[in-house]
Regions:
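ABC ATP-binding cassette signature C-motif
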Residues: 1-180
């Protein structure tokens, strides 16, 4: 599922990891324990491909996904819990936005036989197919299910994230990881 082979990480002449190798199989659960500065966060950033090792390689199975919850949260206040959780669906939101743009253009169009109108119809058809394929019709209910499962009440979902403590904000971030 996930293989690390001869991973070396060096910073400014200091070696943090020296040719470490490990394998994680399907269903494995791991915990990283160590003192501050031991490299736990660095290793997780390497595993999520957020950072690159000095040398060595990682191999992931095709459908393998790795996420980690960072220690420091970077929240923009003003979003609701749902709006923040929907950020996990970047591609769906892009497709949805383009669909809305096309609908607005089509509402203003008078010539339904023009080449440009036909091209818009073709693009909209492709977008609709893509939207369905990537789960666009289910992401909202899926998001609610995950958030409720993490302990949020239905009334919480439309509340601003800045009204929640750090622990509850961590749960929102965890929901985003689970939804990706």
């Amino acid at each position: 599922m996930f293989n690390a082979h001869n991973i070396t990480v060096s910073f400014g002449g200091e070696t943090l990891f020296d040719e470490i190798s490990f394998r994680l199989g399907r269903g494995d659960h791991i915990g990283l324990i160590g003192k501050n500065g031991a490299g736990k966060s660095t290793l997780l950033k390497l595993m999520t491909l957020e950072n690159q090792p000095t040398s060595g390689s990682f191999a992931l199975e095709k459908n393998c996904k790795i996420g980690y919850l960072p220690q420091d949260l970077d929240f923009d206040n003003g979003r609701t819990v749902l709006e923040e959780a929907y950020l996990a669906f970047e591609e769906i939101k892009k497709v949805e936005s383009r669909q809305e743009e096309i609908h607005k253009i089509m509402e203003q169009t008078q010539d339904y036989e023009s080449q440009s109108y036909m091209e818009l119809l073709d693009e909209l058809n492709e977008l609709n197919n893509r939207f369905e394929m990537i789960g666009g019709y289910h992401y909202q209910s899926q998001t609610e299910k995950i958030l409720l499962g993490l302990g949020f009440a239905m009334d919480d979902l439309n509340a601003s994230t800045d009204t929640f403590s750090g622990g509850w904000r961590m749960r929102i971030e965890l929901a985003k990881i689970l939804l990706k």
